[in-house]
Amino acid sequence: GFLPSVMISPYDANLISDGGESRRKFLDAMISQTDSEYLFNLIQYQKTLQQRNALLKYFQKNRTFDLDSLEIYNEPITKFGTQIFKKRQLFVEAILPTIQHFYTIISKGNEKVTVIYESDLNEDNFENLLTKNLEKDRQLTYTSKGIHKDDLRFEMNGNLIKKFGSQGQQKSFLIALKLAQIKRIKEITNKNPILLLDDIFDKLDDNRVSQLIELVNEQNFGQIFITDTHKERTESVVKRINEESKIF
């Protein structure tokens, strides 16, 4: 059966430091965990996008152009892309208050964090975007506008967390993001996801790890698996919350 899981690891920092592709993949993975229709639309969109781009390359290579052939792909790209856009928009709106709630608890600070969903479709509908950028797409030989260019903007007090957030603030934000993901999965599936804490001592001090485990325990998120190279350190942290545990 389906057993949802969420991992918190040092590699989560890439969600802040890397480009938009890593954040898109993360957003897609979060939504797809509980929405099979979204996953289907995403697969169809990516497949059609590849075909449209291949046709644009063919046109340039052979110095030809056929608008009717291109529009065969425009219709499904518009259809699937618009559905994906709407679901991404709704998901970010739904999860944001939970992210803010957990960030306040974890950071014990007064900073206001927010997540802004950036998309070309915020400016115009997909059909118009394809029409307006046709010549540009022909020159570039790929589709320059669409939901495959979307991004999530992580802000703290109106500024980019990537540029203005301290290491501690960035860590707190990422943990809040993952905990919000867990809560969202639980709300939709009525199942407790397994939480995997992978080598978190690498980026968090012992007190912050204890706070995290206590918070998760209070929220009744279910089973927690912790990986660490120092057995004694893990035992010390687990003992603080007085919960049943097993060390392997």
Tell where the protein language model's regions lie, with residue ranges.
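Conserved nucleotide-binding/hydrolysis micro-motifs of P-loop NTPases
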Residues: D12-A13, E21-S22, D120-N122, H230-R233
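H-loop (His-switch) and adjacent beta-strand-loop-beta switch element
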Residues: I241-F248
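Secondary-structure edge/capping motif, primarily at the C-terminal ends of alpha-helices
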Residues: L56-R63
